[in-house]
Amino acid sequence: MAGRSGASDTELLQVCKIIKILYQSNPCPEPTGTRQARRNRRRRWRARQRQIREISERILTSCLGRPPEPVTLQLPPLERLTLNCSEDCGTSGEKGEGSPQISLESSTILGTGTKE
């Protein structure tokens, strides 16, 4: 695995094997029996899958030190965002060689919410 040390690679492979064994221990339910029996088996199977997913997350967090939540992307305030069509205007196959964009206030574009 490119850019990673060998020790963390073996640890990652070991964790993947453990998680694979967990998922293999819960095969899909059999499609036999009455509708109610099939529904109950699927419900129990989904509950076990949910537990396996939670256990897998805990294993990854404890063994690899993965942060529990992904890093949030910091976005600028909506007031500072603008649409700029000078780079990729038009449909596919056309070049965006149009006239320059005219900046309009958002209130003139969206209106005030009252009908005239």
From Swiss-Prot:
Post-translational modification: Asymmetrically arginine dimethylated at one site by host PRMT6. Methylation impairs the RNA-binding activity and export of viral RNA from the nucleus to the cytoplasm.
Location within or outside the cell: Host nucleus, Host nucleolus; Host cytoplasm
Keyword Phosphoprotein belongs to the record: yes
Region described as Disordered: spans on this chain: 87-116
InterPro entries: REV_protein (IPR000625)
Domain notes: The RNA-binding motif binds to the RRE, a 240 bp stem-and-loop structure present in incompletely spliced viral pre-mRNAs. This region also contains the NLS which mediates nuclear localization via KPNB1 binding and, when the N-terminal sequence is present, nucleolar targeting. These overlapping functions prevent Rev bound to RRE from undesirable return to the nucleus. When Rev binds the RRE, the NLS becomes masked while the NES remains accessible. The leucine-rich NES mediates binding to human XPO1.
Self-association state and partner proteins as the record states: Homomultimer; when bound to the RRE. Multimeric assembly is essential for activity and may involve XPO1. Binds to human KPNB1, XPO1, TNPO1, RANBP5 and IPO7. Interacts with the viral Integrase. Interacts with human KHDRBS1. Interacts with human NAP1; this interaction decreases Rev multimerization and stimulates its activity. Interacts with human DEAD-box helicases DDX3 and DDX24; these interactions may serve for viral RNA export to the cytoplasm and packaging, respectively.
Protein's recorded name: Protein Rev
